[in-house]
A protein has these predicted regions:
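Solvent-exposed, non-transmembrane alpha-helical starts
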Residues: 50, 83-90, 161-171, 213, ...
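A short beta-strand structural signal in non-transmembrane regions
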Residues: 74-79, 140-181, 188-191, 451-458, ...
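Juxtamembrane segments of multi-pass membrane proteins
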Residues: 56, 73, 386, 390-517
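Short beta-strand elements
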Residues: 73, 103-119, 142, 184-194, ...
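Juxtamembrane extramembrane loops of integral membrane proteins
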Residues: 44-104, 108, 460-468
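Membrane-embedded transmembrane helical bundles of large multi-pass transporters/channels
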Residues: 1-45, 49, 62-63, 161-424, ...
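Extracytoplasmic
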Residues: 59, 95-158, 200-204, 485-551, ...
Length: 766
């Protein structure tokens, strides 16, 4: 069958090929610029910056942080059979002393408060009895995480300005702990808990992810391309094009101010995979011989024939990722725009640089070098009648699995809950890493979910006695719930001070006692800088209440926050002094809840926009809405069926897997576009069987090879240390394989059904 072409496009591509040396030179210069830009991209994998800065909660949290600045909080768990034994306390005292000498580190434990109450005393058997009584005479130490059944806690505050400074500080802390961490001392284990260690691990692994997986994918790619085309020259043209495209695409981040995040590894990988698929389509068509008079004309005609489907398919993928710009999750938004921009660069390179390299390297045609897949024509001959015979089972099975996948994602009322959502920082850390295990150990007993309640009052009234009394009632109400571990605020300072001086941590409830307590708090704030952390000392216009608990015990996402807000409203209604105050939930914990609640809207909104734009764009190209819907079956089948796999495999929606809809739709639509484009070519014969045979012969082989490349590329992520990236690799690879199966079963079956329906309508009309 002759290749249909546009004479003007043939003339254009002829000039492109003739300018091959100039084109290669220009892209070489852009390659150097891209490499420079890629090296300038900053790292920003922190979870607390996932929400865009313009978000109201993010703005409020930023204002709160400016008013109540504090360093990074961390905790050392010194585990021992008896944490209050003489040896344990002596070792803890030594550790606290050495940590206090490290720059930017403030350390305190229950011994800090004991020395404040009793002065500096040598720890001996008699003194240990008094320390034990002091430590166990209140619940304050256990609530603060400074004492557990089998551990002694040392709280740390790191006042560091940069990640590099933080890493140096953590290294200094580790050098202090190393001699005691081998089990030779009184402690059976020393656990490190807190965001400094988690953030350091994430930054290290995020930065290494791209460098680790891109070479691995490159090995897969080179092996597959060589096996498919069996030509070093074809391999060279494809590899050089990919290297230039990826370098320029990554370098765009420096131009637009984007940064490396926990999911930015997907940008070069997605650009490389999509570009590779397009290059496979282009080279497969180039290798097919025709009746052209010379190689230059043949090359230009092949490019012209594939220009429309390749442009449409790359547009589909770019739109899919560009639709992520609607997300309120900043890394997702940036990743979508970054990938879409990279795909535009890739499209230009596919129709300029790649043809230039094909010409310069004189890549062989199929008559000169046999490619893999000699068995494929026989498969096509068997598939065409099989898809006609089993058209209804193929399409019906696909629709049934799609319904099951939708149920797995959105849930079934009364029977099945929706697919779970996760943004807890621990879900981004390898569970086998020591830092994750240490943090989970503390989380199970003390909880790590923190909500900051910013209570705003009339300026100058933050220390009014009645207001403080109302805040203490609110604190007691929260602490009466066993799911709440600790509540710290201005009145907790009074409780600590009262316990140190009198041995009782209970504050009086009588109104006439609070004027003196308010005066005492003012005096404490004058002498103790730590006490100022809970009051706006500049304007006395607000106070801060920090609430820590286990959010998982409250149920669905955001339930702990709603409980705190409802408790505040109840106490506020009962306390006249609180009625003029306004409370706002802020902080990293609240931002985490916001992110979680926006994951599903990000998935549905971006997917809906992607699907709508793709449908409208290709309706303009192919002019057949019913056929266009039919050709989307494999993509929709792959996306929804993969949610069923996620449900069965226990994989939750997170910052990476939430992208599966747009990623798979944009990537797999490439196959359906090429298939349907060549199906229309074959329809000129008037036979559905011949049209399907032509589409499978021309597009089927590159669809198969492109899917193998796509799935192997994303499967490389399965070796990642970052759980979300590993899960995304497994899920996306599964989706590509599912789409491939549907391409050769459900899609032809749907086209058979559509063609028979059209013939029936024409028969009735005649």
């Amino acid at each position: 069958m002759s290749v249909p072409v546009s004479p003007k496009m043939v003339q254009f591509f002829t000039r492109v090929i003739q300018a091959r040396v100039w084109i290669a030179g220009c892209f070489l210069a852009l390659f150097a610029v891209g490499i420079y830009g890629a090296l300038q991209v900053r790292d920003d994998p922190a979870i607390d910056r996932l929400v865009v800065a313009a978000d109201p909660v993010a703005r409020a949290t930023a204002d709160f942080d400016r008013l109540y600045p504090e360093g990074d909080q961390a905790l050392l768990m010194l585990e021992a059979p008896d944490p209050l034994s003489l040896r344990s306390l002596q070792a803890a005292q030594q550790i606290e002393s050495e940590l206090g000498r490290i720059p930017h580190v403030e350390a305190h434990s229950l011994l800090t408060l004991y020395r404040r109450a009793n002065g500096e005393r040598e720890l001996d058997a008699a003194e240990i009895a008094r320390v034990r009584a002091f430590a166990t005479g209140t619940t304050l130490f256990r609530r603060a995480g400074l004492l557990g059944e089998h551990y002694l806690g040392v709280a740390l505050e790191l006042r560091v300005a940069t990640p590099a400074e933080r890493d140096r500080t953590l290294a200094a802390i580790d050098s202090v702990l190393r001699p005691l961490g081998s089990g030779a001392g009184p402690f059976t284990a020393i656990r490190r808990v807190g965001s400094p260690w988690l953030d350091a691990w994430l930054e290290q692994r995020t930065g290494a992810a791209t460098a680790r997986f891109m070479p691995l994918f490159g090995i897969f790619l080179m092996a597959l391309v060589f096996i498919v085309y069996r030509s070093w020259r074809a391999l060279g043209a494809i590899i050089v094009t990919l290297a230039v495209v990826v370098a320029i695409a990554v370098g765009l981040a420096d131009l637009f101010g984007w940064s490396h995040t926990v999911i930015s590894t997907l940008v070069p990988l997605t650009v490389m995979v999509t570009t590779t698929a397009t290059l496979v389509y282009l080279h497969a068509r180039y290798m097919e011989p025709d009746d052209c008079a010379n190689p230059l004309e043949h090359h230009a005609r092949a490019l012209t024939n594939k220009f429309l489907p390749c442009t449409a398919s790359m547009f589909a993928t770019a739109v899919g990722f560009g639709a992520l710009a609607v997300s309120d999750i900043q890394p997702v938004r940036e990743m979508g725009l970054w990938t879409a921009s990279g795909l535009i660069v890739a499209w230009v390179a596919c129709f300029t640089l790649f043809p230039a390299l094909q010409s310069l390297l004189r890549t062989p045609l199929r008559t000169e070098r046999a490619a893999a897949g000699k068995w494929f024509p026989g498969l096509v001959q068997a598939l065409v009648p099989a898809t006609r015979r089993y058209r209804w089972p193929f399409v019906g099975a696909a629709l049934a699995l799609m319904l099951c996948g939708a149920g797995a994602l959105f849930g079934i009322p009364g029977l099945l809950t929706p697919l779970s959502l996760q943004t807890d920082v621990l879900t981004y850390v390898n569970p086998h890493e020591r830092v994750a295990q240490d943090t989970r150990t503390f989380q199970q007993s003390n909880g790590l979910d923190v909500i900051e309640l910013w209570v705003q009052t009339t300026p100058g009234h933050a220390l009014d006695p009645e207001l403080l009394r109302g805040l203490e009632r609110f604190t007691h109400q929260l602490e009466s719930d066993p799911r709440i571990t600790a509540v710290d605020g201005p009145t907790s300072t009074l409780r600590w001070e009262r316990y140190v001086q009198s041995g009782s941590d209970r504050l009086p409830s009588a109104p006439d006692a609070w004027p003196k307590l308010a005066a005492d708090l003012e005096q404490i704030m004058l002498t103790e800088p730590a006490a100022r952390a809970y009051v706006d000392v500049g304007n006395l216009a607000s106070v801060r209440i920090s609430i820590r608990g286990r959010a998982d015990l409250f149920g669905r996402t955001g339930a702990m926050r709603r409980y705190v807000e409802q408790t505040w409203l109840a106490v506020q209604a009962a306390e006249p002094a609180l009625r003029s105050a306004h409370a706002l939930a802020v902080g990293r914990g609240v931002l985490g809840t916001e992110i979680t609640e926006r994951l599903l809207p990000t998935l549905t909104e971006s997917f809906a926009i992607t699907a709508s734009l793709i449908f409208l764009a290709f309706l303009l190209v192919f002019r057949d809405p019913s056929a266009r819907l039919m050709t989307m079956i494999p993509s929709l089948f792959a996306i929804l069926a993969v949610f069923l796999i996620m449900r069965l495999g226990g994989i939750a929606l997170n910052i990476a897997t939430i992208l599966i809809g747009s990623t798979v739709l944009g990537a797999t639509e490439n196959d359906q576009i090429h298939f349907f484009y060549h199906f229309q070519e074959g329809s000129a014969s008037g036979s559905t069987a011949e049209a399907l045979r032509h589409a499978m012969q021309v597009a089927g082989r590159p669809i198969l090879f492109a899917t193998l490349i796509n799935s192997s590329g994303f499967l490389a992520l399965a070796l990642s240390d970052l759980p979300p990236m590993r899960q995304f690799g497994i899920v996306s690879s599964s989706a590509f394989i599912l789409a491939l199966l549907a391409d050769f079963t459900a899609l032809p079956g749907a086209l058979w059904i559509l063609s028979r329906g059209k013939r029936r309508v024409l028969t009735e009309a005649s």
